[in-house]
């Protein structure tokens, strides 16, 4: 049987909370014969922030990708750096998350340049919330020696 553990955005919005859920997952994995499947949401506020910036683009307002990324980039990287203790694992996690953040910045800059938000581009932008939180949790689990999750 499979056990699905779902964690919302509030559960992953700080390093301490990420460590708490990683320990819950580790305990469940250790104490259960079930396969554990973990689902994490975007960090609290990320989806709203993406909707906000795309709404501004749709309304023809001048949008600063740089200001958006000044908020998003350090927030995600700070959580990661404070949740993971193993330097090697942290460096791998930083690489993955930084690449995603760079991609987010580039996609957003392109949308601003075109001054057009299509349903497809909005969906793609919104996917970054989960795509950023997932490796943070995954590498935190690796930090706890759960490398196959």
Question: What role is predicted for each listed range?
Answer:
Residues 1-147:
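Nucleotide/pyrophosphate-binding catalytic subdomain
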């Amino acid at each position: 049987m499979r056990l699905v553990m779902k964690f919302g955005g509030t559960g992953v919005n700080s390093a301490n909370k990420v460590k708490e859920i990683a320990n819950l997952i580790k305990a469940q994995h250790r104490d259960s014969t079930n396969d554990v499947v973990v689902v994490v949401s975007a960090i609290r506020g990320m989806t709203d922030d993406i909707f906000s910036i795309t709404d501004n683009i749709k309304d023809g307002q001048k949008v600063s990708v740089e200001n958006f990324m000044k908020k998003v980039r350090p927030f995600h990287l700070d959580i990661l750096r404070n949740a993971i203790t193993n330097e090697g694992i942290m460096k791998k996690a930083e690489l993955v998350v930084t690449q995603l953040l760079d991609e987010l910045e580039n996609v957003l800059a392109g949308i601003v340049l075109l001054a057009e938000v299509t349903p497809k581009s909005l969906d793609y932008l919104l996917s970054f919330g989960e795509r950023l939180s997932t490796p943070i949790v995954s590498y935190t689990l690796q930090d706890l020696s759960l490398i196959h999750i």
